[in-house]
């Protein structure tokens, strides 16, 4: 979902969204005058037509009323209390998950028991269109909205697959780059 004050939308690659040319999704649209409703297999998006940015007053995303679909309702700004959390950037100074007497502040991750994920890509840098791509600022920095909403129920593999369609495949180093790993928890004897 995108909002731009000048009506020009960003289709270039960002640090998160490498691929903006994803496969088409089956959907139906209903224009009800002041509102528009877009229904897919996974969600129903209800948008109240307005001149301002997307917000809790003009956007509601719900689950379709279908057997086997985990029910949810989401509005912008709503906190996901069932998020499974993500990763932490550094463990320097931590003892387990504690830094002194403070627990580690872990940001929301991609997966949630709520069955949905909201990703705000509005502040990420874009890649320019040069042969040797470099980062560039957005035209409407701080004013435009570039959001992704994924509804997947408890099919976490589908969530990961869908995310890699947008973000690109994750590069993994080859196994040989890790060298020889061997570990056991008891002490070695002289004979070993």
Feature annotation, model-predicted:
Residues 180:
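Conserved, well-structured core segments
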Residues 188-192:
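Short, acidic/polar
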Residues 1-33:
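A low-complexity, Ser/Thr/Gly/Pro-enriched, surface-exposed linker/loop concept
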Residues 29-175, 183-185:
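Catalytic and substrate-binding clefts that recognize carbohydrates or anionic sugar/phosphate headgroups
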């Amino acid at each position: 979902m995108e909002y731009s004050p000048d009506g020009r939308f960003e289709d270039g690659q960002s640090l998160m969204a490498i691929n903006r040319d994803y496969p088409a999704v089956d959907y139906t649209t209903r224009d009800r005058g002041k509102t528009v409703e877009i229904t897919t297999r996974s969600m129903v998006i209800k948008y109240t037509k307005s001149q301002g940015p997307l917000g809790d007053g003009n956007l509601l995303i719900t689950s379709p009323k279908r057997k086997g679909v985990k029910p949810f309702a989401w509005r912008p700004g709503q906190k996901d209390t069932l998020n499974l959390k993500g990763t932490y950037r550094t463990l320097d100074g931590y003892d387990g998950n504690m830094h002194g007497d403070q627990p580690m502040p872990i940001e929301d991750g991609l997966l949630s028991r709520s069955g949905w994920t909201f990703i705000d890509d509005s502040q990420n840098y874009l890649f320019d269109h040069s042969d040797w791509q470099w980062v560039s600022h957005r035209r409407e920095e701080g004013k435009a909205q570039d959001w992704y909403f994924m509804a997947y129920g408890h099919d976490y593999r589908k969530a990961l697959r869908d995310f890699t369609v947008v973000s690109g495949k994750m590069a993994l180093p080859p196994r040989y780059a890790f060298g020889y790993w061997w570990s056991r928890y008891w002490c070695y004897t002289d004979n070993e």
